[in-house]
Amino acid sequence: MATPRCSDPTIDRASATDLMTLASDHGPVPMNIGAVLVLDHGAGLDLRAVEAVLADRVPRVLRLRQRLVRTPWGCGRPLWVDDRAFDLRRHLSETRLPEPGGTDTLLRVAAEAVCEPLDAGLPLWRARLVTGPHGDGAALVLVLHHVLADGIGGLAVLAALSDGTGSPAQALGRVPVPARTPRPRELAVEAWRGRLNAAVHPATGLRRVVGGLRELGLADGLPRLAPATSLNRPTGSGRRLTVVEVPLPDVVAAARAGNGTVNDVVVSAVAGALAGLLRSRGESPGELVVSVPISSRRTAQPDRLGNETGVLRLTVPTVADASERLRSIVATARTRASVRGGGSAAMMGVVFRALAGLRLYQPFVDHQRLVNTFVSNVRGPAEVASFGGHRIAAVLPVAVVPGNVSVAFDVLSYAGRLTVTLVADPALVPDLDALTDLLAAELAGEVRR
């Protein structure tokens, strides 16, 4: 049989938000995101079975078979190209939990997996099968580089890899023919065409600048600095994870009662928990600044991942009254309700790339006073999903952030439950268990009101 010819190339470049992510990826932890799929009745699931499932489903997601490569000088932004030597086995591994096993040990393994850099010469993802000490139970830890997908894009990947999705053609596991890599001349022509288009239509760029200023809260001038706290010190290479779970309908009801959103309720609870922890350390800031990602899209498709996310800075009073905190958050969010996410990322990307070029990026993020913490919230599937015939009992989100934010909060709704993963540098947050208990109490208080 004749070898099929390569298809004509599509010039698929990294976006402005992708460039910001790449500029940010210079610290002691990589810019990775991940998810832990806890499988019901996972006993008997082995790496060979996982490989068979993924061999059918990875072709559904183009990015999982593509590498991000730099282009020659004058040829524009980095380029996504098909990995002609793609080998699924390079992306798979297996770990058996040591005694006694359990959730805490699983979370430790997941933290190690997410904090391990991905091979830049391969498609930027990996999957690790984690089994119990005696082969009892299983979980799949999926790790993606943030440049490959944001939170919403990550959900599209999970959906494509789960059972019962994809077209009949995709279900056959047909591997697409790799496209020919564009030649330097083609890249240069396309890059200059884009530059000329931007020069001819400056209004588009101006609108993005204005939108970015609004996202960052800079439309009316420079914001107040975030308070200096013991939680904001340069972080190292290790992370520890803990988890808080609550019934999603209870949080939805609390949000409606306060005229807010689920995310507003979570941010209020996070601010209350952090304030309580800081008080136990002898600190009493009057407010905390929380960074919340906002996306320019509601959903994503497996063939359109990437990053389309900006940031929203929320200044939250640290009062004990949860109702007052929530009212403040709702009022701020409403003033920026018309903001379309993504503009701030484009602006910050320019700044971050300049800092990286001057070797000043890491000192900047290690001592920044823009935010105290991050809260990332993604709406997951409402129904229970499965993988390889095994029911996915829980999905635990994990993302690591660089700089001087020693604890961040990753939030995901799935099948009627709301899960908050606390991701902390254990050297700077040795009292993470206390913070976890405080957050659980704050969320319980929010839903009881």
What is each stretch, according to the model?
Residues 2-17, 35-405, 411-440, 444-449:
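Soluble acyl-CoA-dependent acyltransferase catalytic core bearing the H(X)4D motif
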